[in-house]
Amino acid sequence: MSPQSALLLADIFDRWRLQLPDPIVNWLTPVWILCVGAAAGLLLTAVLWGVLRLLSAIPGIGTLADEPTTSRVAIVVLSIVFLGLSIGIYQGTRRAQAAAPAAGAAAQPAPQPANPQDRIWGWGGAAVGCFLLAVALVTLVSRRALAETRIAIREGVLWPLFVVGTVLACGSLFGLVLIRKPTELLESLVRGPALWMAGTTSVPIDLPAPPDQFADPAQQEIRVNFRKDEIRSLIVKSDQHVRVRTEPFDSQTDPSLVVTLDVPAGEEKTWLRDQAGANPFREAIVTKLYAKNLSTAKAHVDVTPILKVAYPEMSLVPILAVAMAGVFFIYLLLRAAFPKLSAVALATAKSDIAQPIYLILFVIGLFAIVLFVVIPYNTFGDDIKQLKDSGLSLILVLAVIQSVWAASTSVADEVEGKTALTVLSKPVSRRAFILGKFTGIAWSVGLMVAILGVWLLIWVAYKPIYDFREGGYEINHQQQNTDPTWHDCHREMVQIVPGLVLVYLEALVIAALSVAISTRLPTLANFIISFAIYVLGHLTPLLVQSQVVANQLPPIIFFGRLIATVLPVLDHFNIQASVAAGVNVPTVYLLWSLVYCALYSTVAMLLALTLFEDRDLA
């Protein structure tokens, strides 16, 4: 879409936009971005499913998963191809990053070389990921797996997730007449890949020497082409003394609104855009800058504009889209690769969702999150941090209660009620029974965390508006007399997304341990032990690191370290410090938390299989 078309559509939508108060629009804009992500997720899922459907129609590919030897060869070949593509993309990205600091070393430091150990871990993880992707592709391209898509959506947790996603996608359509200039926001989705592929380019120009050293240097135009809302910095490098301006030198514009770079010979100057200040460029598409050669020799000038998308907040859309598509295809993959395990998981998830306690926990979560918004915390401007912490803690507690209750009812009660004996009398192994129970609990808990998480995101986006009206919200830690912008609401909203991921990972660890306990103990004992593990998992690090306890009660330190070695340290999934400091959680931390969760869940499942293997079910 051309810039002129985008601006025209933006004006059309702006004319039809409902005239809502600015605070409401600022709240609804990040919510609309969330809805666009859901719509993109449904669209991406449909497109990928269509591609798999077309591939399955090719003779020999649709039946590839049914031929073990051929499928193994295909997996190896696809793994090599995916790894090669990953290496190519990585090398291209590294070259692009290396070129950017070369053009503007003053703007940003050069990237440090990667640690060899981190590089080994990174490429090892990439190889494993490529292998798993190849296995998934060979399995999902099966005609049998794709034929069961409709049944898979209508049963289990995919249907409520589909309903929620559809409601959010409809919200993206209604948002077109509620927010300001939505086409400009949507255009950032297209401009992001375009800017990444274009990279950072310099505009060279030679400025002739003045005919007379006493004469006023002539003004020269520098031809550029970028959008004013995408410029982040401007780097000018010259071998002679030059001066570059964003307006003609004879312009009567207020000097505070004009960028002037005086570049000495052999140096470079960098202008950094102040996001809170006025944009010095007046035209939507900047096509020219102005320069003068202040030396007595010919000057060679390199002008490098550093561009980024106008609305980086839209990066949430592809992340949500990939996450939604990933959940859908992981569900189909488990159903196709492990049919017996998936049958047990489906029955477990449907049974858990149908329980009255599941609905009760849902209602408690929905009402409590809204209540947290209006509760005065009296924190002198940090009420929103308390809302985030309270909301995440609430979702975690509800998820833990649901996981322990589900493990007790689906394993312990079925064993005591002889229902498990009936299931195992069919061609279902004990291993598939236990793993299926855990998978079903993981799906039901994931549904709860997802829906309550979206509800929390919506109200966290509203909290800055509410607190500002109550006089308790500070923008950028400085009191201002303007309402929080939608950028502020979006920033507060996305900061808790990693927290929701960690909440789910912690609930999975508790669920795995609860399943292992429920293979031998009844419901009450399972609740007591599981919540004791929950408390110790959060309390043990404090005891181990306490200097007062270390000096006065050394035995407690010993037992604390012993418990920390045997039991999972659940404090790794707690981001309360990050929320209090207002900083984002690094992606690497989430990946290591995922590895930690996978390791402890695997150990718990091995323990559950060992305890259940010789359990007398008669």
Walk through the language-model features, giving the residues of each.
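Short, strongly hydrophobic alpha-helical membrane anchors
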Residues: M1-T29
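Aromatic- and glycine-rich beta-strand/loop motifs that create alpha-glucan
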Residues: F338-L359
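Beta-strand-enriched, solvent-exposed domains that form extended recognition/catalytic surfaces
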Residues: F174-L316
